[in-house]
């Protein structure tokens, strides 16, 4: 079914080129159904790229999905045109009375700072708390997963000796959990981070369930509150060339960076990536939308508590 996106969002034309069915608000109003309302708090620097990556994965849904973009007042994006932010993003203060069937909170390039040192920490933790009573299910990604686990459950993060960078093999610990419907026993996920959360800390908290891990990249997915909170440390949403872009950017800046592991054909940047995560990325997002948003949310959205 189609995605309902804000009129003239750049992702619309980009995704139409991939034969993904999206409609704008003008056409969606002609369909007499209640769409699933999904809000995305996009903390990534390249917001248009992240918008496109997430919208692509939200395209396989059981119902029309209405996408809104949230921003925080205490931080100004330096890598996205101001006009784009004004047109497509809304301050949290103006959305706090609204309710949503689902929410996605992205990663952010602040993981090497202590949580409390992040200039928008107070505002984002207010959003974390707000989501618990205004959203049916929230998906925290990468830094947001670490931040959410720390804020809600006191789980610390730890600095890595070197960047976790590449495509890593994962396994499911509860293969019958609905979030893994259709998954293979092993699957691949991109990671790009300097910090980690650890299994032993997760297992100490009875409210948390570890769902998936990797021998190389550690904790991948944690669930809480019966599926109302998912914490995902990797970047399943990444497009095929995202790690390549990050690698070449750091090389051009003279930064210490290794070739992303298990990513390029024969580990040769000139041969391009071998994409092994796309199928499971689509399953992850469609399962989340189906089993934890669509099937759990009340018909009257005001009944979300």
Swiss-Prot record:
Site feature: Important for substrate specificity: 192
Catalytic activity line of the entry: L-homoserine + acetyl-CoA = O-acetyl-L-homoserine + CoA
UniProt feature coiled coil, ranges: none
InterPro entries found in the cross-reference section: Class_I_gatase-like (IPR029062), HST_MetA (IPR005697), MetA_family (IPR033752)
One GO term of the biological process aspect: L-methionine biosynthetic process from homoserine via O-succinyl-L-homoserine and cystathionine
Assigned EC number: 2.3.1.31
Disulfide bridges in this chain: none
Site (Important for acyl-CoA specificity): 111
Keyword set, alphabetical order: Acyltransferase, Amino-acid biosynthesis, Cytoplasm, Methionine biosynthesis, Transferase
UniProt superkingdom: Bacteria
Primary subcellular site in the record, as a coarse category: cytoplasm
Binding, substrate: 163, 192, 249
The protein's annotated pathway: Amino-acid biosynthesis; L-methionine biosynthesis via de novo pathway; O-acetyl-L-homoserine from L-homoserine: step 1/1
MF-aspect GO terms: homoserine O-acetyltransferase activity; homoserine O-succinyltransferase activity
Active site residues of this protein: 142 (acyl-thioester intermediate), 235 (proton acceptor), 237
GO CC term (a single one): cytoplasm
Record's subcellular location: Cytoplasm
Function as written in the Swiss-Prot or TrEMBL entry: Transfers an acetyl group from acetyl-CoA to L-homoserine, forming acetyl-L-homoserine.
Family: Belongs to the MetA family.
Protein name per UniProt: Homoserine O-acetyltransferase
Organism: Bacteroides fragilis (strain YCH46)
Gene symbol of the encoding locus: metAA
């Amino acid at each position: 079914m189609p995605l309902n996106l804000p009129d003239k969002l750049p992702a619309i034309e980009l995704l139409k080129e991939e034969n993904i069915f999206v409609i704008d608000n003008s056409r969606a109003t002609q369909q007499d159904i209640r769409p699933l309302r999904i809000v995305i708090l996009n903390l990534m620097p390249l917001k248009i790229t992240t918008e496109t990556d997430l919208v692509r994965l939200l395209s396989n849904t059981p119902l029309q999905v209405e996408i809104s973009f949230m921003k925080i007042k205490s931080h100004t994006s330096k890598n996205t045109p101001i006009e784009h932010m004004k047109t497509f993003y809304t301050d949290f203060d103006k959305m706090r009375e609204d309710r949503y069937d689902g929410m996605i909170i992205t990663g952010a390039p602040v993981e090497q700072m202590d949580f409390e040192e992040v200039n928008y920490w107070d505002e984002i933790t207010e959003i974390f708390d707000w989501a618990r009573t205004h959203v049916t299910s929230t998906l925290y990604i990468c830094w947001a997963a670490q931040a959410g686990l720390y804020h809600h459950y006191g789980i610390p993060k730890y600095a890595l000796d070197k960047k976790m960078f590449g495509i890593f093999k994962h396994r499911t610990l509860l293969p019958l959990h609905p979030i893994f419907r259709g998954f293979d026993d092993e699957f691949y996920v991109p990671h790009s981070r300097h910090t980690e959360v650890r299994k032993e800390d997760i297992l100490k908290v009875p409210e948390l369930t570890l769902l998936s891990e990797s021998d190389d990249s550690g904790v991948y997915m944690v669930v809480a509150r019966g599926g109302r909170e998912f914490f995902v440390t990797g970047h399943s949403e990444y497009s095929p060339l995202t790690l390549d872009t990050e690698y070449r950017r750091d090389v051009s800046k003279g930064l210490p960076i290794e070739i992303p592991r298990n990513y390029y054909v024969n580990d040769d940047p000139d041969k391009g990536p071998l994409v092994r995560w796309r199928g499971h990325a689509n399953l992850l997002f469609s399962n989340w939308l189906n089993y934890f948003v669509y099937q759990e949310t009340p018909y009257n959205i005001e009944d979300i508590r």
